Amino acid sequence: MSEFTLEPLYDYPQREQVLALARTHASAVDRGERSPFENLREIAKDGLITLGRDGGSLVPQVSVAFDLATEDASTAFSLWAHRSTIAFFDAVGRELPEGLADATVSGTTAMAAAYKEASGLAPIKVEGTLVEGGLKLNGSVSWASNLYPGGVIVLPVAVQNAPESHPNRYIVTVRQDVEGLSIDYHRNLLALNGTESGTLKFEDVFVPSEDILSDNIEAFLHDVTAPFLLVQSSFCLGLAAGALQEAAKHLDVSQGVFRPEFPLILTEYQSLREELVRLASEPERAERRDLLSLRLGVSHFATIATHFELQVVGGAGYVATSPTARRLREASFLPVQSPTEGHLRYELARYDHLENLRDAL
């Protein structure tokens, strides 16, 4: 008999409470009736959203995101965006804005455009003009999440009037309710309705000089990519693990016809799990190619795992409000989450191309 035990990536004293909290409120969060930040504020009391800030192992932090996602991917997603925002301030040696460490203030990463421009896929769409005392911002960010009143947003800006030979790409922070910033919220999503996602529109938004976090975007991205992708990958894998846990209960369906596939799926799961732990153990040494490959791999695997769960659970899993259906919907978001499937495949193809060139030479 094939079995699956949901083992922690890293065991910590509050793990059972984290799982129970996520399980209890998963349906309400999915319906948009409860904010994921209500869950994050609970676990923040035990310091579980600020783990690994000393520059050491990220395994404890990715473990929390993984565990949340086995029961509720929306809360795990919100943790990823919030924890990434914390990492942005840490990368430039800034103190965290008040409320970020305990999740009484939300953190929003609007960094997709920075990664896209760095890869040659698309330009940064928020433009900045240097003015006395800071910058004026105009433009838009097509998608960001955790958009709560008073929240902290970090984003890249293309500076239009930077002096010659000076940097013209900045990383800045603004508050969600700053004058000139409007939000068009995305409602009735296929999944993750509780994540307060929307489009940001900037119209002459003033950013004081002290809120410019960096004018070295290349170095900034280098420093934040590992925590950004590792916590993201962990909740993708946690979502898949939740599907496998449920699927394992139904392997005798249809006279066990699906049973031979399960060990093969578990082998891939174990491989991805080991790679996640390896990279998170020493994030500063993680190679970018490995991080991108892991992120793409766990996204694909979540799709495989959730579809397998639906196959073995059967009609009960097709009920829209069931945990099986919720996981299937949540997994459908992963290919469009930044970095998108297209972005990941494009970057990895470039690595392959360079490798082929080296081999040819």
Regions found by a protein language model. Name each.
Residues A316-L361:
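Glycine-rich phosphate/cofactor-binding loops in nucleotide/flavin-utilizing enzymes
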Residues M1-G55:
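A generic N-terminal leader/anchor concept
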Residues R23-D30, G52-R53, D252, Q270-H300, ...:
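C-terminal helix-coil-helix/basic helical segment that borders enzyme active sites and/or dimer interfaces
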Residues W143-L181:
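A short core secondary-structure module
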Residues V59, L130, E210-E218, G314:
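Acidic-glycine-rich active-site phosphate/pyrophosphate-binding loop
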Residues R34-S140, S145:
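Glycine-rich flavin
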Residues G238, P263-Q270, L292, L296-T303, ...:
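Generic structural signal for well-ordered, non-transmembrane alpha-helical segments
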Residues R187-Q270:
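Glycine-rich beta->alpha junctions and the first turn(s) of the following alpha-helix
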